[in-house]
Amino acid sequence: MRGKLSRRALGLGAAALAGTGGWTGRGHAQTAPLKIGGLLPRSGFLALIGQACQRGRDLALPILKDMGYSVELMNADFESKPDVARTQAERLIREGANILLGAFESGATLAIAQVAEQHGVPFVIDIGSEPSITEQGFKFIFRNFPTSVILANNGLSRFSDIFQASGKTPKTAVLMHVNDTFGQSMLHAIDAYAATGKLPFKILDKISYDPQAKDLSIEVAKAKAAGAELHMVVTRLNDAILMVREMVKQRYDPMGIISPGSPGMYDLQFLKVLGKYADYCITNVPWLDPKQELNSRLARDFHKAYPDQSYDLNAGFSFEGMLICADAYRRAGSTKPEALAEALRQTKLEKRVMIGGAIHFDVKGQNPDQISAAVQNLGGKPVPVLPAANAEGKLVFPMPGFDQRG
């Protein structure tokens, strides 16, 4: 299949060069490219998503070159294991990485953050939502992705928009969620939001499960037995597929399947494997901005390079991570950690790929201004349906029953 990443391309320490020097910032010329140590789970149970993120980084190289940036990408696979992420981060630093970038999985991202802070090396988090990472007073950590609290709050507030737009509001819901670091942090955020009384429905039951589970029949049966009108989920990719397959098998037809902000249901593999049963699932997540010229360029390059793959937030945030690193280097004019960190603190990128305002970081190193769109699978593709300003399709809610789809 075209677009599939070879082992050679993904080899540890593989480097790709984008651009040459020549720009002067703060009176210092860029005499060498910035070495970005990129960490992702390109093997193990998160491999498909890790490889999707890698595509966004790889495509950033020629685009950044055209923009006049000078960067080199050093790749490392942490095999979907946080302990391996730690050792890989240490290896990249030993081999000369000036800045680290990663890492999708929250446990691994936290491990890398600890290594980066210990060594005084800047770490840009392109995807990773564990709240504690930016609550520990770290000086070298900068996150462009929303925390699970921001993600959940944005996603849960979008539920009311969905119900208002459709004219249908469920009174009850059941929650199925993964029990890993990400799933637990999302659960805490959902509980906190529910305690405010802002949820338009009552959660009747909360069902946790291992994201590496091979069978979810018991969990789905329990969810069905709750008798809730809405099925709310916090998933990864493989478990999301298992869950919907089991819902079809057990003839469990809620009004809708909605995530307040998790991967899985908008991923290409989910759409391919489940076919018509993947349609009408909704995920409330940060999404690509159709009005940004940089997004148009990235989308065009992506579809040309990977015609069989899905262009989604994994590629978008991964690209933005590369852009953030390159922009900081150009303004710092130096690869010294302190200079890069100071430049990162002053980041203000109006031209970006994702919806939301300019990329910037607060005193904790967090971009606080990300927003979420309601992204619904329609006709085998993830399509933003809300807010209206970013919509590219029309919301369908409640969803048709599984046995009513042609």
Model-derived segments and their meaning:
Residues 16:
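Alpha-helical DNA-recognition elements
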